[in-house]
């Protein structure tokens, strides 16, 4: 974790204990951080699992194995290594992951494919098997820790621990969620975009859990960007221990299914926002809302073209109401747009309507809005009913400083 805390940081929430999910931490020593860097979460037998993963074709062995093993639907453990991504490391990297899976599986007397592993850090450095083995051994013997301690342990360039919670009533039974996430740089929307872990005590069929997570992901994690770079290790996993005692949710027709899906979506959205708020060097949180598109998917792609534009992001960093850069980003998005119907605004003040600047446009309220930390950009394409909101942060000198020195 970085010593310099983001000005957009949020306090860590009070996360509930989740029956059947117990976190532990240990120090493997992947980097000379002087802190714990390995997280182990023990899961009750029968825990359902769902996941979404990066589509970066240079993904890590952790992602490859996780993507394959999530299909069997159940999990007994999660292990997260911080300080070494183990991506692009060939057979040695895969052997290191399989060794962790085998070690934990032997401890729990479960199949290795029910042990999920994630790693984060520098690409191209094999995970040291001896350090991993010792770290896992220490974690297996460690006393349980808090969710906040686990959240701190999975971080790399993160400046604050990130967590979210929610609850839902299912046929009179309260089910709870506790979630942690890490992410600060190399964040772009492509399935996941960081390492996120969601735990609930609800009883949920694995296929239904996957459907809910995939839907929530599309509307939350896939709508954020910090720097347009999609990591080789991106993973979001959801675990449902089934300990709450509710009637199992098997489809959207199950009583309480809508409430469960809504709570899961709320957790994912909160986590996604926290990642943006911890964007490397970020000073401002930006919400880009696009309306009037030919479809919601088209609106999302236009929004991301704006959110990924270095010129837009640096203008926001400089508190410059240069709405022409938004026009540029819309035009390059490759989506249906009509120059003569396009409208652009900041903070609820329209600067241009129907393809031209407003004659009575007053930049003063926009300039005042841009001095704040919470920025909104509004775009109306004037073509249809499609809408979407995406979230990003500004681009500052701090981002360059962090990434120029990342390996040192």
Region locations from a protein language model:
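A structural signal for small-residue-enriched, beta-sheet-centric alpha/beta enzyme cores
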Residues: 2-81, 85-98, 105-408
């Amino acid at each position: 974790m970085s010593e310099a805390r983001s000005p957009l940081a949020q306090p860590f929430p009070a996360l509930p204990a989740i029956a059947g999910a117990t976190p532990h931490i240990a120090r493997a020593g992947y980097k000379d951080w002087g802190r714990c860097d390995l997280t182990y979460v023990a899961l009750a037998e029968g825990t359902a699992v769902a996941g979404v993963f990066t589509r970066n074709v240079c993904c890590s062995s952790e992602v490859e194995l996780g993507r394959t093993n999530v299909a069997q639907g159940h999990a007994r453990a999660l292990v997260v290594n911080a300080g070494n991504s183990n991506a692009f490391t060939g057979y040695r990297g895969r052997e290191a992951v399989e060794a962790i899976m085998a070690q934990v599986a032997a401890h729990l007397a479960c199949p290795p494919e029910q042990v999920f592993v994630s790693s984060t850090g520098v690409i191209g450095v094999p995970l040291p098997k001896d350090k991993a083995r010792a770290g896992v051994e220490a974690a297996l013997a460690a006393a349980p820790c808090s969710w906040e301690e686990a959240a701190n342990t999975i971080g790399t360039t993160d400046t604050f621990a990130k967590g979210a919670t929610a609850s839902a009533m299912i046929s009179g039974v309260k089910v709870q969620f506790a979630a942690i996430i890490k992410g600060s740089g190399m964040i772009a929307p492509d399935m996941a975009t960081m390492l996120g872990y969601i735990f609930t005590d609800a009883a949920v069929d694995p296929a239904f859990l996957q459907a809910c997570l995939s839907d929530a992901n599309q509307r939350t994690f896939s709508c954020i960007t910090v720097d347009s770079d999609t990591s080789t290790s991106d993973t979001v996993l959801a675990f449902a221990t089934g300990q709450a005692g509710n009637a199992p949710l098997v489809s959207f027709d199950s009583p309480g299914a809508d409430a469960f899906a809504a709570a899961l979506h709320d957790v994912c959205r909160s986590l996604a926002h926290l990642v943006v708020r911890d964007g490397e060097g970020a000073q401002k949180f930006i919400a880009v809302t696009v309306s009037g598109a030919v479809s919601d998917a088209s609106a999302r792609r236009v929004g991301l073209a704006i959110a990924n534009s270095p010129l837009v992001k640096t203008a926001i960093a400089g508190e410059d109401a240069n709405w022409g850069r938004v026009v540029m980003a819309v035009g390059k998005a490759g989506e249906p747009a009509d120059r003569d119907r396009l409208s652009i605004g900041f903070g609820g003040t329209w600067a241009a309507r129907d393809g031209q600047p407003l004659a009575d446009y007053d930049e003063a309220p926009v300039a005042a809005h841009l001095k704040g930390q919470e920025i909104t950009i509004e775009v109306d394409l004037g073509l249809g009913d499609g809408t979407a909101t995406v979230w990003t942060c500004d681009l500052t000198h701090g981002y360059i400083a962090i990434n120029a020195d990342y390996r040192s």
